[in-house]
Amino acid sequence: MSIDSDVDPSEVSTAKRKPSRSWLLIDAAGNSTMLNVDSYAIIRRVHIYARDLRVFESSISSPLSIRTREGAIVLNLEHIKVIITADEVLLREPLNENVIPVAKEFERRLGVENRERRGQPDGKEDSGAEVDAEKDESPFEFRALEVALEAICSFLAARTTELEKSGYPALNELASKISNRNFGKVHKLKISMLTVRVQKVKDELQLWLEDDDDLGDLCLSRKIATTSSPVSDSDEQINSYPTSPTIGAKISRAKSHLVRSATVRGDDQNDVEEVEMLLEAHYMQIDRTLNKLAELREYLDDTEDYINFQLASSRNKLIEFEVIITAGSVCISVYSLVVGILSTNIPFSWNTKEHMFKWVVSATATLCAIFFVIIISYARYKKLVGN
């Protein structure tokens, strides 16, 4: 995951044409300086590739990532775009409304911990409290990485809390009364979009936790300390002999293995464990946020099932009503047909018989009523109505 300090000229020329960007430089003492420089100046300062800065461009849809280089950690965590070295932090777009709190947190945390490491007071009198004797000896890059991860995890947790506060009442209103207004409230929740954002952070942290060698690449201070190790002397002796390209590649891989082996012994292993605990803590935090979103999604699915059940029940009632109306219409049509026939002004022998018309009409009405009861009874028997 490391690169040489040399910069590719083609990438430099590409970066040089880019306009200047605002950066906030925060050193190990917590002092901040606003920089307005182009990408080439940043590349020369921290020795990274131009493609590492392209992921910061808002016009490019780049995935969330944590990258390590020879002397820098490049973080692209949504709106938090930061480059961390062993002694300074470069924060992109510090005037963004979402980045301003992060910049202040960097200044506060790094400045406070620097004063604690020196045993200096904060400038404010504590109520009889003394500075702990056991100071935080974590490397600068670990403390800066902790601030960045805590910022993105807290940001997503806050968005999740806001979604819960608006989501559960909206779902309850929709369950109690199905309407376009309540449905519009639920449609604006955007649970899936936030879940994808949280899942990306979790996947990135999980990817780093799966390999201890990758965790060792985050120890920038140890990398700098090992540059003057005895391994460098052996490298000079090896490089003094001419080698073929194939043998040179093998020697290069062997040297990389030696350097990697030297950085995971002794105190380096402690640094690996420390950064692993750091990532695990934020992994658990982002996992809790993802669980909250999963619970909200499950509640949404349950509400959707309940609404579908209510709609199906209403649809069944309409079908039952339609069956009853159809049966009644058939019976009334038969009755109207008989009455219409008897009402025609045609000479007929029954016209001379008194009360014959009333008997026929009454009998027809009775038969139609019996026919209607038979239809409804059959529909109930077939469980078409009355369920």
Curated annotation (Swiss-Prot):
Region (Disordered): 113-137
PANTHER family named in the record: MAGNESIUM TRANSPORTER MRS2-2-RELATED, RNA SPLICING PROTEIN MRS2, MITOCHONDRIAL
Listed CDD domains: Mrs2_Mfm1p-like (cd12823)
Main localization of the protein described in the UniProt heading: membrane
Designated name of the protein: Putative magnesium transporter MRS2-9
Cellular component annotations (GO), alphabetically ordered: membrane
Highest taxon, organism lineage: Eukaryota
A biological process term (GO) from this entry: magnesium ion transport
Species the sequence originates in: Arabidopsis thaliana (Mouse-ear cress)
GO molecular-function terms, A-Z: magnesium ion transmembrane transporter activity
Keywords, sorted A to Z: Ion transport, Magnesium, Membrane, Transmembrane, Transmembrane helix, Transport
Parts of the chain that traverse the membrane: 323-343, 359-379
Compartments where found: Membrane
Family: Belongs to the CorA metal ion transporter (MIT) (TC 1.A.35.5) family.
InterPro entries hit by this protein: MRS2-like
Ranges annotated as biased composition (Basic and acidic residues): 113-127
Function: Putative magnesium transporter.
Electron transport keyword on record: no
Topology of this chain in the membrane: Multi-pass membrane protein
UniProt-listed Pfam families: MRS2-like (PF22099)
